[in-house]
Structures are given as C-alpha cells and as structure tokens.
C-alpha cells in the first residue's frame, strides 16, 4: 500500500490530558507557549546546524524571526490543547533553556511506511550547542524514554532523530 502523505493520528484514551510539565533529573519540560518565544528564537538561531545534524530533516531552513516563531508556538499550543501533538520547551533546573522535544503523529515528520505503522508516536528533540556540550542531548533522550513509559499512553515510540545516542549498558 502507498502511505505517501498519510499520517497515523495519536490514539489517546478519551479524556486523557498530556502533562503540561515533566521532570527528570535536572531537566524540566513544559508545554511550549508564547512565553517561551524569546528563548526559543535564540535557541533555534544558535543551533541551526546542530539541529539539522542531530534531529535531521530540513527544519530550520535558516534563522527564524520572532514573529514567525510566535505563530509557530501558537500552532503548537493549539495542537497540544487538541491532543494532536505535544511540543515541550526544555530547561534545566536553574531555568536555562536547553531546546525542545516533540511528540508527533507518525507520518507527520517522517514519511509513513509499512514499517512505521507499528509505532504510535514519533519522538524527536534538539538541544542548543552549549547543552549538547554538557551532555544534555543524551540526557534528554533518556528523559524522553522515561516520560513516554511513565506519563503517556503510548505503547511503542519511534525516536526519529538522525542521531540516536547510545545508552550505557
């Protein structure tokens, strides 16, 4: 079957609400909102090449403006509220911006294929260069795995980043 352009919607229990805040070790994630715009714009614009290398894909195509990103964050807020996808701004426990993580329907970010049908969420993330140097890329991956298992109703997550960290045995 040709799945080109199809998206497998998130299958959420009736009445289930995604957590607005998540914590793991010294990582704090909160549902992204317009209040995160300045941090997010600075983070994206400082991280373009790192995002492309680690998360993969073609976004961002270049620096983002405050106005453009504001519209994007309003869209993420609406998607979160409707349960269509979940985007989080990520900070450390001291309030320093680290990056973002995304829980999307399979097929939105990565083209849907027969092999991907078994997954019920597409998980991706990125961190700023400073956060990457301090090991937060791997730490956020560990946190995401924990949150998917403990805070979300997903049975099988597809971690779609181009660079997937190796976890200690």
Regions found by a protein language model. Name each.
Residues 1-130, 143-169:
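GNAT-family acyltransferases
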Residues 131-139:
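Glycine-centered recognition micro-motifs in short, flexible terminal segments and loops
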